[in-house]
From Swiss-Prot:
It is found in: Cell membrane. The keyword Disulfide bond does not apply. Its main location: membrane. It is a multi-pass membrane protein. This is Uncharacterized protein MG120 homolog. The chain crosses the membrane at residues 35-55, 81-101, 102-122, 135-155, 164-184, 223-243, 268-288, 302-322, 328-348, 352-372. It comes from the Bacteria. Keywords: Cell membrane, Membrane, Transmembrane, Transmembrane helix. The lineage of its organism: Bacteria, Bacillati, Mycoplasmatota, Mycoplasmoidales, Mycoplasmoidaceae. One of its GO terms (molecular function) is transmembrane transporter activity. GO terms for cellular component: plasma membrane. InterPro entries: ABC_transp_permease.
């Protein structure tokens, strides 16, 4: 029971810290903004689909449901999540350090090309390990990707060449060189004249057949790699000194230099780690599906017209997710629904691309919400404009209570260390003190808000112009605010009864005045 009680208090404390702690404000706003805009993009996409002749309104919902009726679609969906996640992680890691790695596509292609060339041309045909071939593939592709990433890093760090320019140039160089090597050395003897691809990778080296037990489970292996990479990056950036130094470098180069950090070192290392993630991405893209080939279908086959779009998808997702690994996984999942679910739902490629573009555009303009402040509009709607000051005071009081609790727990811990006392497990004393302060703060806020609302409308009853067009709307809003405030008082008590009576008499007086009009 003590353990459960402690966990309950701990959960409530963490929840309050998220809602009221000042240092969580930016995180709260970014989550509100991203969530609001994703919902808005769903609404706009729904009406867009409904407006297209011949497409039913239920088609939008089928994007998220119909793909689960087919095993192949489910596998493609899981694999697509892994691809988007790894691409976004590769971009976002560099972005956290203040460098814009636009070369994910080229680094991925370089890693894939190096891995295929080594396995198909350098390794003897008799070398087909019973176990561990996939690890060799991953290591080879990481080596190829990291090499290219280090070239971009060296140009940026040592020669002051803009990383965007050098990465874009290298993207094209790598795609064209890869096409030449594939066409010259590892192209199948008999092939479709309209398509351009390499020889299949042997099963012993492909993620598609990871083991005898996991044959054709490349989608699962891909998902495990992506989730493991996201967890690793999250832990590295949040809980390690190295991660904090990387973030510090991204936040302020001059500040990091003043603190004694080698900015060049951390920028270079960020490219290296991004290259490792690009190598993992290459393994998933080119060896985790049943083709197991280095294909050029997404860049124009024989007439190469572009670089792989995978890296640019990762840039969009990384920016939408604000470079957070957890949010990258969530956004990748949402985008994958549209990418994979559009075809089973009956949407053509153009409509699917339009829906995807709308979702990405809306989610990417989250900064607009900082000025619109939808969360503030909801507060105004529920407790009225005149209670904004009371709400701000309540937030400040809650933040002070949280800070006091954190500081008291820290002092208790230091005192135990100093006095060499035994650790008291599941001690809830400080949490209980905090809950009492919280209840007192809530009660004060509720009473102040109720009285402010009553006083305002009593004054409105005397001076307001009921002929004003917006008066009826204001009165309806007032009724909503009454219900919202009365929900604060749990169970029947004298305060709630008195408040209900005051609201009822005020409503009656306002209604009579409206009838007199």
């Amino acid at each position: 029971m003590n353990a459960l009680n402690y966990l309950k208090h701990r959960f409530l404390f963490s929840k309050d810290k998220f809602w009221y702690a000042p240092f969580k404000q930016k995180q709260r706003r970014s989550i509100y903004s991203t969530f609001s805009l994703i919902v808005l993009s769903f609404i706009v996409s729904f009406f867009l689909i409904v407006a297209i002749p011949g497409i039913k309104g239920g088609t939008f919902l089928e994007i998220f449901t119909r793909l689960f009726k087919d095993r192949i679609n489910i596998e493609n969906f899981a694999r697509q999540i892994a691809i988007y996640t790894l691409a976004a992680l590769a971009f976002s890691f560099c972005m956290s350090v203040g460098v814009f790695n636009i070369g994910i596509s080229g680094q991925m292609m370089a890693g894939a090309n190096f891995g295929f060339m080594m396995i198909l041309k350098v390794f003897p045909e008799s070398f087909r390990p019973a176990f561990g071939g996939q690890i060799i593939t991953i290591l080879l592709m990481i080596l190829g990707s990291v090499t290219v990433a280090m070239v971009v890093a060296a140009l940026k760090v040592f020669f002051k060449v803009n990383e965007v320019v050098s990465a874009i140039m290298l993207n094209w160089v790598i795609v064209l060189v890869s096409a030449y090597l594939v066409g010259t050395y590892i192209k199948p003897e008999k092939t479709d004249t309209s398509q351009f691809y390499s020889i299949e990778l042997p099963d012993a080296f492909a993620l598609y057949n990871f083991s005898d037990v996991q044959q054709k489970y490349g989608w699962l292996t891909s998902l495990v790699i992506a989730i493991a990479a996201a967890i690793f990056i999250a832990v590295l950036m949040k809980f390690t000194v190295f991660g904090h130094k990387l973030k510090s470098t991204g936040l302020s180069v001059t500040g990091s230099q003043a603190a004694g950090y080698s900015v060049k070192k951390y920028q270079f290392l960020s490219f290296v780690i991004s290259g490792i993630l690009s190598g993992l991405l290459a393994a998933v893209v080119y060896t985790a599906s049943f083709e197991k080939q280095l294909t050029f279908s997404d860049v124009g086959d024989f007439g190469i017209t572009s670089v792989p779009i995978t890296g640019f998808d990762g840039i969009a997702i990384g920016l939408i997710a604000l470079n957070s690994p957890a949010r990258i996984v969530i956004v990748s999942t949402i985008i994958s629904f549209v990418t994979i679910g559009a075809k089973p739902a009956g949407l053509n490629a153009a409509t699917a691309s339009l829906v995807l573009g709308i979702m990405m555009y809306f989610a990417a303009i989250y900064n607009l919400m900082i000025y619109i402040k939808p969360w503030r509009m909801i507060v105004k709607l529920n407790i009225s404009k005149m209670n904004e000051a009371a709400y701000d005071e309540f937030q400040n009081e809650m933040a002070a209570n949280l800070e006091t609790l954190s500081f008291q727990r820290f002092l208790d811990k230091q005192k135990r260390k100093h006095d060499k006392e035994r650790m008291v497990w599941f001690d809830t004393k400080r949490f209980e003190e905090y809950q009492k302060k919280k209840q007192a703060t809530l009660q004060t806020f509720h009473e102040n808000s109720s009285q402010n609302l009553l006083q305002y409308w009593k004054q409105q009853l005397l001076v307001a112009d009921v002929k004003r067009l917006t008066f009826k709307w204001d009165f309806l809003t007032f009724k909503h605010q009454q219900k919202y405030i009365l929900r604060w008082y749990k169970g029947k008590n004298k305060k709630q009864t008195a408040l209900e009576n005051e609201f009822a008499s005020l409503n009656e007086a306002i209604s009579q005045k409206l009838e007199e009009k």
